[in-house]
Amino acid sequence: EIIGAEDLVAKRAVNESVAKKILSAAKHWEDKAKATGEDIRKINPIPANMAAGISSLEEKSLGAIAKSGTSPIQDVLKYAEMPKGSGLYFVDSWMSSLSLPLCLTACGATIMLYQMGGGKIAQHPMMPSINPTVVSPFLYLTGNAIAYSRAPDNFDFDASPIMTEGASIPEMGTKLLEHLSAIASGTMTKMETLNYAEQLELYMEGPVL
């Protein structure tokens, strides 16, 4: 998700050691893909990305990076490793939208915001707050007015008024924070009310039988 623009992410590291970890993580996954005969820089963007208007791997990575905001990156965490302090952390993990939520929950996340792309919704039986095992509500967000109009029941928040109605980013940010607070206080997410669930996916490196 950062390959092609990893140098920009590294610049946000709190120190040189963390910057090296970020660059090393990107290189690790790129080398791992090459070892299987695939070149991430050549197979991206995928057809679905291009259909949505993305023209290059770098552009795709810049979009992913933009979602992280501008805060300094405190450290790089391994899959399911909990942070040792407050602030923004980079999790060195596979990009699958099916395995990442479980990873972030194991890292200690108690609520998650997911910017919906062009794929279908994904939700996990262990994730909803109504389940007594893992408490981590999952909110789906979009900034695409067309996507929201086609499937309003799938999204918890629509930020498209910034582009369609001239709403300001701070204004929509306040509305999102208010909605986030309501979810954290017990209001159910759209996926919880739909009761839509998929199989839980654990990420494991290497062949799996």
Q: Where are each of the predicted segments found?
A:
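Anaerobic metallocofactor- and corrinoid-dependent redox/one-carbon enzyme cores
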Residues: 1-209
